[in-house]
Regions:
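Short low-complexity stretches enriched in small and charged residues
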Residues: 1, 29-38, 155-158, 183-187, ...
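Linear, non-domain "peripheral" regions
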Residues: 1-136, 140
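Short glycine-rich loop/turn motifs that provide flexible caps or phosphate-binding loops at active sites
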Residues: 58, 179, 203-204
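Long, hydrophobic, amphipathic alpha-helical segments used as structural scaffolds
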Residues: 86-89, 162, 193, 197-200
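Secondary-structure boundary elements
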Residues: 99-180, 188, 195-196
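Hydrophobic/aromatic-rich core segments of domains that either
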Residues: 152, 184-225
Length: 225
C-alpha cells in the first residue's frame, strides 16, 4: 500500500482584465478496488461565484466553476491524497475469445463499444500505410503482442515534444511530423487500434517521478494521456 500526494497548480496571467467563462475541472480521481481517495481540496483565485459538482457520461467527477468578476490572474490549486495498492506486475487479463486477433466482441457488448471502434479522423489512409510497415493486416496473431507492437512502434519511431497549446494533432499530422505530445501519441494509438477492430478511448493520469530513487523521467510530474 502506498500513499500518494498530488499537488497541482495552474496559473493564467492576462495583460488586461478578463472575465473568465465557466470552467470545467477534472482533477478528482476515481475510487476503485486498488485506489481509495483520502482527501481532495480545491482553491481558486479569484473566488468563484458558484462551484457545482456533476458526473459526466463516463462517470468522471466534473467541477463546474463560474465567475462574476474580472481579473488579471486566475489560479487553480488542487491537493489530492490517495491510497494506492498496485499489483506487483501488470496482469492484463484477456478473454479467451480475444486472445488472437482478429476477433469479434460479444454481441451484447457491441452496442456500448461501437462508438469506440469507429475511427474519428479521416487521414487518406495514412494510418493504414503506417500499420502495414509492421502489422500483417488480417493475419492471425496474439492480441497482446499486436498491441505491444503498436506501442513500441510509437515509442521508438516518434520524438516527444511538450506542447502547451490547446488541442490535439490529428494522427496524420503526428505521422507526418514524427513527433508530438502524449495526447497526440495516445490519439494515434487509439485510431490505429480502431483500424484493427479494437475499441479504444482516452484515459489520463500522472507520471510518478520518485524524488530520490531514480533519474528524472521525460514528461514526469505532468498529467498524461
Amino acid at each position: 500500500m502506498t500513499i500518494f500526494s498530488v499537488h497541482h497548480a495552474t496559473t493564467y496571467r492576462y495583460k488586461r482584465p478578463v472575465r473568465p467563462g465557466q470552467h470545467q475541472l477534472l482533477f478528482r480521481p476515481r475510487d476503485s478496488f486498488d485506489q481509495r481517495l483520502l482527501d481532495c481540496r480545491l482553491t481558486i483565485e479569484p473566488e468563484p461565484v458558484a462551484i457545482r459538482w456533476i458526473h459526466d457520461v463516463f462517470g468522471n467527477c466534473v467541477t463546474l466553476v463560474d465567475f462574476a468578476a474580472s481579473t488579471t490572474v486566475l489560479t487553480f490549486d488542487t491537493s489530492i491524497r490517495l491510497e494506492h495498492t498496485p499489483e506487483k506486475s501488470p496482469d492484463f487479463l484477456i478473454e479467451d475469445y480475444a486472445r488472437s486477433h482478429p476477433f469479434a466482441y460479444h454481441p451484447e457488448e457491441q452496442p456500448d463499444l461501437l462508438p469506440y471502434m469507429r475511427r474519428h479522423h479521416g487521414d487518406d489512409h495514412a494510418i493504414d500505410e503506417w500499420l502495414a510497415r509492421f502489422v500483417t493486416i488480417g493475419a492471425s496473431q496474439p492480441t497482446g503482442r499486436l498491441l505491444m507492437t503498436l506501442n513500441e512502434a510509437i515509442a521508438e519511431g516518434f520524438s516527444y515534444q511538450r506542447r502547451t497549446a490547446r488541442g490535439t494533432q490529428t494522427p496524420a499530422e503526428t505521422l507526418a511530423l514524427q513527433q508530438g505530445t502524449c495526447r497526440d501519441f495516445a490519439l494515434l494509438m487509439m485510431e490505429a487500434a480502431r483500424s484493427l477492430g479494437f475499441a479504444a478511448r482516452f484515459i489520463t493520469g500522472y507520471v510518478y517521478v520518485p524524488a530520490r530513487d531514480g533519474p528524472v523521467r521525460l514528461g514526469g510530474g505532468s498529467t498524461h494521456a
